Amino acid sequence: MSEDKYCLVTGGAGYIGSHTVVELCEAGYKCIVVDNLSNSSYESVARMELLTGQEIKFAKIDLCELEPLNKLFDDYKIDSVLHFAGLKAVGESTQIPLTYYFNNIVGTINLLECMKSHDVKKLVFSSSATVYGDATRFENMIPIPETCPTGPTNPYGKTKLTIEDMMRDLHFSDKSFSFAILRYFNPIGAHPSGVIGEDPLGIPNNLLPFMAQVAIGRRPKLYVFGDDYDSVDGTPIRDYIHVVDLAKGHLAALKYLEKYAGTCREWNLGTGHGTTVLQMYRAFCDAIGFNFEYVVTARRDGDVLNLTAKCDRATNELEWKTELDVNKACVDLWKWTQDNPFGYQIKGVDSKFFGDKGDFSSRVVSLGKGTSFEVKLANLGATIVDIVVNGCSVVASLDNETEYKDQSNPFFGATVGPYANRIANGTFEINGKRIQLTVSKEDGNVVHSGINSYHSKKFLGPIVKNPEAHIWTADFKYVDEETEFPARLSTLVRYKVDSEKKTLTVEYESKVAGQGSTGANITNHTYFNLNKFNEATIKGSKVQLIDNTGLEVNNKLLPTGNLKKYTQVATFNDSPTEITEKEPVLDFCFVSGLPAKLDTRSSPLTPVFKLSNEDAKLEVEVATTEPTFQVYTGDYVDVKDKYENRAGICCEPGRYIDAVNNPEWKSSVVLPAGETYGHKLSYTFRTL
């Protein structure tokens, strides 16, 4: 069993659950998300990781299956539970009531059984204002207090009330259990970052996501059900609460249970203010900057005039109140909708497990799938696993995570960092302090960060977006946990795939996580073989460089301080150099002519390397903002039963070799807290 304490969040990949996980993480809790993904997506979990900068453990489990749930409780020290999982559509529940009763109630029974057998005593339950039914049938019950008699009118609400009763009965039998029952009203909005939000599958059941889909062009018009109610504009009044406020309410309830053990109590979560349907329509139109069509139709069965919450109990006891109004919710929802018009479901994107089946932290995500330019990326090392051009793979790649973790892997496609290339004797000085890294037994230096290398680390994410039909982006993030370097780095790797231009752009951005200064030099280590489908090596390909001037190096491949012409390779002004079985042998650092600085992204993306193959009728051009680029002809690439030497050629843009020990270049690789390291590179493929 793990030693760390965890908060288990069932249904944590869903709308309200995901926003609550973010609040929990930001408050210092470690979370495990359990979800069967029947009406949600794992992509929300990947996005939560980047949003919080933390690993969020995930298990795909159906609560109706007791055995895997029980094993999860065996494997982790679970301290508390937030229970969101369940079917939740009111209308659907009237069509398939038995499914709702089985899923929601049996799943909760299993959860409570596991809690009881593992001595887990705290649970925050996601109930609903639907347990009240039509509160207007009573006098003086609007706004609705927790003392209002219950009377749900649909199977969904009845399952919620039944679960509440189960918890009250369990608490009556064992006062060591603590239950916070949260009855909330109408959640709206999205996280202000636009990274997570509501992603309804099919036709939205709720007003705001339906309006958003009309505004973005996915649906023709909005339907308003009735305008003859006794309200200011004739439409029903509801209590709309920003989902971030709602998530913070769950955090407040959990803290209450931690403070007052043995509690079993209900709290309304709402704003206490009513908004009509047309008032909400106008607020949303103000947020998006234009009006869209709506049509008034007949009243909907079961709708009542006013369902507004009385929230005094939550304000007084949980010390919680809403801070975000409906206008802010509309603004945040529109940002989410614009950034993610189809939610988490993105055309041209596919993901598969890369490690053990069911390990969602290790996936390969394909961008541009179904086009003539597809890029496959892995969490491990934020690695470029494959680039497929016109249906053919053009890079050296391996089959799975195990092969990439093997010591024989020559960093194929990996993000190399936190410090690429060589550091002499594995030592350097920052702010008067001498740093010593674990050196290589072969030459006594450190290459590609040695034991600290990113290529074997699991990156969080990715956040995948599709801003244009032919463009996809994927953001990966890694925050150093333990490192021999003097400070931890938080590194963002952003891939951008343009299937029309057949270009892959990579952007790196690093900041110190905390205090101090450290070395930073991050790049990619992809090996190209444009004729891979016909030829096992790069024999027959042709290469050119922007300049064949490079750093002179000693027998340990460390710079002497002089520049040298490497005439065995052609420049852009010459006829390209043809690669044979043995010549040329390249493992040199060439200069691009671009300035060396801490963040080079303001420099122009400059072509520095071209590789072509006439048989494949293909060329790749590497462009960079960096001052140097290392070129390897792969003479020591020998992966048993997979690849032989010269299986690919690598162009690795970066800073000067051993810059951290050179006064002239040191400022370009020493990153202090509060400043930013960055650079860009691109791979563009063209048909000859």
From Swiss-Prot:
Disulfide bonds: none annotated. GO terms for biological process: galactose metabolic process. Induction: By galactose. Keywords: Carbohydrate metabolism, Galactose metabolism, Isomerase, Multifunctional enzyme, NAD. GO terms for cellular component: cytosol. Residues 1-346 are annotated as: Galactowaldenase. It catalyses: UDP-alpha-D-glucose = UDP-alpha-D-galactose; alpha-D-glucose = beta-D-glucose. Its EC number is 5.1.3.2, 5.1.3.3. Its cofactor is NAD(+). Pathway: Carbohydrate metabolism; galactose metabolism; Carbohydrate metabolism; hexose metabolism. The keyword Repressor does not apply. The keyword tRNA processing does not apply. GO terms for molecular function: aldose 1-epimerase activity; carbohydrate binding; UDP-glucose 4-epimerase activity. Residues 347-688 are annotated as: Mutarotase. Mutarotase converts alpha-aldose to the beta-anomer. It is active on D-glucose, L-arabinose, D-xylose, D-galactose, maltose and lactose. PANTHER family: UDP-GLUCOSE 4-EPIMERASE. NCBIfam families: galE (TIGR01179). This is Bifunctional protein GAL10.
